[in-house]
Amino acid sequence: MLKYKNVVFDFGNVIATFDEDYILGKFCDSPEDLELLRSAVFYNWAQLDEGTADYDTSIQHAKTLVPERLHDNVTDFFRNWHKYLQPIEEIWSLIRKLKENGASVYILSNAPTHFADHADFYEIVQEFDGIVFSAPIVMAKPKPEIYHHLFDTYHLKPEDSFFIDDKPENIAAGQALGMDGYI
């Protein structure tokens, strides 16, 4: 019998690797262009995750930060980056095993609305009993409100839930509310 009824997963760097260099490399050819793109597309990523920045406005602003020859690269990045997170197969296997053993599984992840709209690109998403992405609800980890939103929306008890995230501050926030976790 499982100790926890619910296992909550972050997406980036838990379910799939979010490797900036790998992803950016899909949208440009030179190290110099990669660095130009990085500074342009990630300048307000935290606000995109929080849902406090408009995605299309961010694209337009990012274009002002790079030479004109990279404008199409910026647009292409913002429209397609979600396709280049690399699945972490061990975690996908764990998710399926947990489901087979009767656990409920959830996603709690900071992510732009664009990713929330395209997360089903990853077939593993179909396995989840519930999903909370930050931007659509204008909340983000590690603020307690997003954890409460998860608990309330899916009627979860924190003490019956276990959280897997790649950031210590997110685990600590869950623990402060009674949900055990692992980095």
Where are these regions (language model features)?
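Active-site neighborhood of HAD-like aspartate-dependent phosphohydrolases
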Residues: 1-40, 69, 176
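Conserved Lys-Pro-Asp/Glu-containing loop-to-beta segment of HAD-superfamily phosphomonoesterases
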Residues: 6, 140-168
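Short, acidic loop-to-helix structural element flanking the phosphoryl-transfer center
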Residues: 6, 75-106, 144
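Generic structural signal for small/hydrophobic residues in well-ordered secondary structure
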Residues: 10-13, 51, 98, 107, ...
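Alpha-helical substrate-recognition element adjacent to the catalytic core
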Residues: 25-28, 32-65
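Metal-dependent phosphoesterase signature
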Residues: 48-92
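Substrate-recognition/cap helix-loop segment adjacent to the acidic, metal-dependent catalytic center
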Residues: 89-136
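Surface-exposed amphipathic alpha-helices with a cationic face
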Residues: 92-100, 151, 171, 175
